[in-house]
């Protein structure tokens, strides 16, 4: 511990990059039991990172919920518009996906352990390539991340979680 008046500067804390998977965005933009935890997770630390895969999966989840009549088309459009507005405001950092990410994902899948779904392998490859910690609500994805020794935080609903807010209008993450 540096004493007052010493010439030593306090060490700056490095900001950890956080890669946000689709399950967290769904909980954030739609009313779900994990909505409040997703909001806290997104606000913690620096600018959260996403990939084009997250953008595509988010739109796909909304479309699936509309087809299953779990979500009104107007609500899906509103969630998508708000997500896009947040992107335009710079509230997310976009991590591009390149050939090296596909190669790494393929190597992990070809190793047969841990069990990996195709798109999960790609999410993990993007996170690993950026040196990012994964924030997810997907238990299987979190298990795979930990098996690959990647930093990961799993959002879980606690016993008392009944809030299902969603579609927040926030000023900043």
Segments from the language model and where they lie:
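C-terminal binding/interaction regions
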Residues: 139, 152-153
